[in-house]
Amino acid sequence: MSIIQTAERSSGEDASENVIFQRHLIAYKKAAELVKKNILEIGCGEGYGIKELLPKVEKYICIDKYESSINFKSEKLTFIKSEVPPLNKIKSDSLDFVVTFQVIEHIEDDKFFVEEIFRVLKPGGKLILTTPNKSMTLSRNPWHVREY
């Protein structure tokens, strides 16, 4: 598969993106009520969710296909630059939580993506995933491989 630009970024600094940014931030705030121990975030982008989740966990791994612009420094935090799937840099049965917000709609092989997530989760581990609801949008997003 050729690499296609399918990434979206949102920022709280740009007023035109504030609604999108707030929607993303709410997901992180809700996840912060649930996560603990060792987590993986797939599609961490600019890393603005880290400040919500990092205080709640022992180990935080971030994966994104683009070079990190994360400004956080912590012994608990590891960044991996990688396309997904596969999650070949993550050991099987090693994580308590995987969080991935507004990512699956950008993944060509979504079935393999989910299989890989469950491979790296410990037994009883939890996946926290969000994706836009296609029935609640006005038009198809051109950045999405598919919508759910």
Set out the residue ranges of the language-model regions:
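Conserved N-terminal segment of class I S-adenosyl-L-methionine
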Residues: 1-93, 97-101, 111-114
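Short, solvent-exposed loop/helix junctions and linker helices
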Residues: 21, 107, 147-148
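Short catalytic/ligand-binding loop motif for oxyanion handling, primarily in non-cytosolic enzymes
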Residues: 49-50, 135-139
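A short His-aromatic
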Residues: 102-106
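A short glycine-rich, Lys/Arg-flanked "PGG" loop and its adjoining helix->strand segment in the class I
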Residues: 111-126
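Acidic carboxylate diad motif detector
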Residues: 129-131, 135
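Acceptor-substrate binding/catalytic loop of class I
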Residues: 138-148
